[in-house]
Swiss-Prot record:
This is Histone acetyltransferase type B subunit 2. The keyword Secreted does not apply. The gene is HAT2. Its main location: cytoplasm. One of its GO terms (biological process) is cellular response to reactive oxygen species. Residues 317-321 are annotated as: Interaction with the histone H4 N-terminus. Keywords: Chromatin regulator, Cytoplasm, Nucleus, Repeat, WD repeat. The record marks 245 as: Important for interaction with HAT1. It comes from Candida albicans (strain SC5314 / ATCC MYA-2876) (Yeast).
Length: 382
């Protein structure tokens, strides 16, 4: 008799299978349920270590669907700094700061982590001082919902934003004056980021399937790329190690790697990575390891990619598990992933949030990393 096709697992069954295998993939995993879903997450860089425990904080937001006041939240958690000391890594809210609408993104200023910017569902930007627990500035560079929000890592106070009104704006937050506004995009702007090395360059991606690279000195487009088969571009990330590398995440579920030096309307594509089954929602390069990229998707998955594995030969059985650059898949969320953040002070730790109201904090198993980083003993090839 021929084998009957197996029924796909339900979301609940997938989750149970993931929980069963957690001990093989992670040093630890923490799950905390929120009252309201958070569309944003970011580790704060400041932490303290006492008696083998790290006291850390994260930025979160709320999306209450107008059933309650929306808030920027600061959450605290404990992580283990000593393998012999067990931490309770459930998070708890320690600060709540009100906002006029759901918070789509919240990001701290690189030069002063006590200053946090948010962009909300109305396209408004708010600036908060965590030390004084105040919202000290409010302006509206956009007229519609916005997800694009990025602080300039080189020039203090410069903030670039992008929103559903098709605009990209640069604001000097010391004066709240808009220094640049672009309407070259023909559709919703989904993400904006400053370049990691050059404080004058930033990029946007949008539903019109274009990447635009801007120069803030001239207020003009330096170059552009059209991702024809993307069905719209949702996210981008500049590499913190390779100044000419940018990654974009598409509605089509694919990730494109681009070379800024060769960027043109139909050129600059280095490689396309396939592993997700639905649109990409967020992405971030590891700040610790060159070539390591994390991507989140509507398919409820986060994939860790190792770009140095691109093009490696595979055995047939390995190829069935995915392309060589697919290092690891985090499959614990039960709804689309909204945002993710690499921990700035623990190499292989990520925080992630999804539409299921759950915050995940997870550290990749040292055994997986050791296998990934193991070098071939050349003596066995002689």
């Amino acid at each position: 008799m021929s084998e009957q096709p197996t029924e796909p697992l339900s979301i609940k069954e997938e989750y149970q299978l993931w929980r069963k295998n957690c001990r093989y993939m992670y040093e630890f995993v923490s799950e905390t349920a929120l009252m309201w879903p958070s569309l944003t997450i970011q580790w704060l860089p400041n932490y303290t270590t006492t008696n083998g425990l790290i006291d850390a904080k994260l930025l979160l937001g709320t999306h209450t669907s107008n059933q309650s006041a929306n808030q920027l939240k600061v959450a605290s958690t404990q992580l283990s700094a000593d393998p012999n000391v067990k931490a309770n890594s459930k998070i708890k809210t320690v600060q709540k700061l009100e906002n006029n609408a759901e918070i789509c993104r919240a990001r701290y200023m690189p030069q002063d982590a006590n200053i946090v910017a948010t962009i909300n569902g109305l396209g408004e930007v708010d600036l908060y001082n965590l030390d004084t627990e105040t919202r000290y500035s409010h302006f509206a560079p956009h007229t519609k919902n916005g997800y694009g929000l990025s602080w300039n890592p080189k020039q203090k106070g410069l903030l670039v934003t992008g929103a559903d009104d098709n605009f990209v704006c640069v604001t000097d937050t010391t004066t709240n004056k808009t220094t640049f506004k672009s309407d070259i995009q023909k559709d919703i702007v989904n993400d904006v980021k400053w370049h990691q090395f050059n404080g004058n360059l930033f990029a946007s991606v949008s539903e019109d399937s274009h990447v635009y690279l801007f120069d803030a000195r001239d207020n003009k487009v330096v170059s552009q790329y059209y991702a024809e088969s993307s069905n719209g571009i949702n996210s981008l990330a500049f590499s913190p190690f390779a100044e000419n590398l940018v990654a974009i995440g598409n509605t089509s579920s694919n990730i494109n790697l681009l070379d800024l030096r060769k960027l043109g309307e139909n050129s600059g594509l280095l490689h396309t990575m396939m592993g997700h089954s639905e649109g990409i929602t967020c992405m971030e390069f590891s700040p610790h390891h060159d070539g390591i990229l994390a991507t989140g998707s509507q398919d409820r998955r986060i994939i860790i990619w190792d770009l140095f594995k691109v093009g490696e030969e595979q055995q047939q059985e390995d190829a069935e598990d995915g392309c060589p650059e697919l290092f690891m898949m985090h499959a614990g969320h039960t709804a689309g992933v909204s945002d993710l953040s690499w921990c700035p002070f623990k190499d292989w730790m990520i925080g992630s949030v999804a539409d299921d109201n759950i915050v995940h904090l997870w550290e990749i198993s040292k055994k997986l990393i050791t296998n990934e980083e193991a070098e071939v003993d050349v003596s066995i090839l002689e």
